[in-house]
Curated annotation (Swiss-Prot):
This is L-lactate dehydrogenase. Its EC number is 1.1.-.-. It is a peripheral membrane protein. Keywords: Cell inner membrane, Cell membrane, Flavoprotein, FMN, Membrane, Oxidoreductase. The lineage of its organism: Bacteria, Pseudomonadati, Pseudomonadota, Gammaproteobacteria, Enterobacterales. It comes from Shigella dysenteriae serotype 1 (strain Sd197).
Length: 396
């Protein structure tokens, strides 16, 4: 299959992966309305073309948390990467490291912190949930510190798991799930050989290290699901802020008031995110939520954004809407599943090239020059009637 654009990786991944894995990464919550709007809303943001601007000295470089980035992109924390490619977290981290951008290791990675961190030169970021088992949280933070992780990404939009109906149909969950997954695996030989046989162990590496025993998909659904904490409040984050002396980013912000709370709390950054449409269906897309949040806290805190970003044009759009940096999730996972480290490396090259074209034709020589002036119009005039009341409720 010819890969000429980032979108080609999705089709390739669907062919290679057993359905339970493809649909787990591809799907969203409930009817997947927000999942669709994330992509569609962002694609509708019109860039303002400018000409004859002498763009010969264009630069994508930026700085975030005193780290130099080759472009305003980081790889998002995505669980179970090691089920999509052989030791997938290591391969993705190496690709990000080679490109000069951060890699974020998920709490529920297959490869543990101690396997990924030594494989790269750049300090990686680490993502953590608020869980009932505070002992696990402290253990994970201590290990992340010891491994030299530079930034903590704290995910707060999962006090309870979202309902992902696709998983029951695909075999990730539901009746006879284990047998269905086995039958799917044996009918996808490329994945079965590369990951199923040669990618072992398929533990939840960070959790296994804490529990002192092997773990697997059932623990992902069981132990982790039972440990999400619906009683979470800002107060529960205070001990973590005291313990972690590096940059701390709050992931899962969709409302300007929550963004202001993050500033008051003392966070170093926020991620405008709806968890890729995987938590609460019907909330605003990140693209629609971002401008009001940027109006509220731009300059007071670093603003990152994810959900719906599929190519370099989308990166430029998110920056113009108010983000300082974006996180890639599904986009890099499709590439990882298709061709491992080489696939992610090629994806990042494609995104960089697309960004350069977009910046050249909008007259932005640097990331700081990508502003609302780079857009034809704001999102407000484009809101469907059904979303207008929601947008009003989210206005600063």
């Amino acid at each position: 299959m010819i890969i000429s654009a980032a979108s080609d990786y999705r089709a390739a991944a669907q062919r290679i992966l057993p359905p339970f894995l493809f649909h787990y990464m591809d799907g969203g919550a409930y009817s997947e309305y927000t999942l669709r709007r994330n992509v569609e809303d962002l694609s509708e943001v019109a860039l303002r073309q400018r000409i004859l601007k002498n763009m010969s000295d264009l630069s994508l470089e930026t700085t975030l948390f005193n780290e130099k980035l080759s472009m305003p992109v980081a790889l998002a924390p995505v669980g179970l990467c090691g089920m999509y490619a052989r030791r997938g977290e290591v391969q993705a981290a190496k690709a990000a490291d080679a490109h000069g951008i951060p890699f974020t290791l998920s709490t529920v990675s297959v490869c543990p912190i101690e396997e990924v961190a030594p494989a790269i030169k750049r300090p990686m970021w680490f993502q953590l949930y608020v869980l009932r088992d505070r002992g696990f949280m402290r253990n994970a933070l201590e290990r992340a510190k010891a491994a030299g992780c530079s930034t903590l990404v704290f995910t707060v939009d999962m006090p309870t798991p979202g309902a992902r109906y696709r998983d029951a149909h695909s075999g990730m969950s539901g009746p006879n799930a284990a047998m269905r997954r086995y039958l799917q695996a044996v009918t996808h030989p490329q994945w079965a050989w590369d990951v199923g046989l040669n990618g072992r162990p398929h533990d939840l590496g960070n959790i296994s290290a804490y529990l002192g025993k092997p773990t697997g998909l059932e623990d992902y659904i069981g132990w982790l699901g039972n440990n999400f904490d619906p009683s979470i409040s800002w107060k529960d984050l205070e001990w973590i802020r005291d313990f972690w002396d590096g940059p701390m980013v709050i992931k899962g912000i969709l409302d300007p008031e929550d963004a202001r709370d993050a500033v008051r709390f003392g966070a170093d950054g926020i991620v405008v995110s709806n968890h890729g449409g995987r938590q609460l269906d019907g909330v605003l897309s990140s693209a629609r939520a971002l401008p009001a949040i940027a109006d509220a806290v731009k300059g007071d805190i670093a603003i990152l954004a994810d959900s719906g970003i599929r190519n370099g044009l989308d990166v430029v759009r998110m920056i113009a809407l108010g983000a300082d940096t974006v996180l890639l999730g599904r986009a890099f996972l499709y590439a990882l599943a298709t061709a491992g480290q080489a696939g992610v490396a090629n994806l990042l090259n494609l995104i960089e090239k697309e960004m350069k074209v977009a910046m050249t034709l909008t007259g932005a020589k640097s990331i700081n020059e990508i502003t609302q002036d780079s857009l034809v119009q704001g999102l407000g005039k484009e809101l469907p009637a059904a979303l207008a009341p929601m947008a009003k409720g989210n206005a600063a």
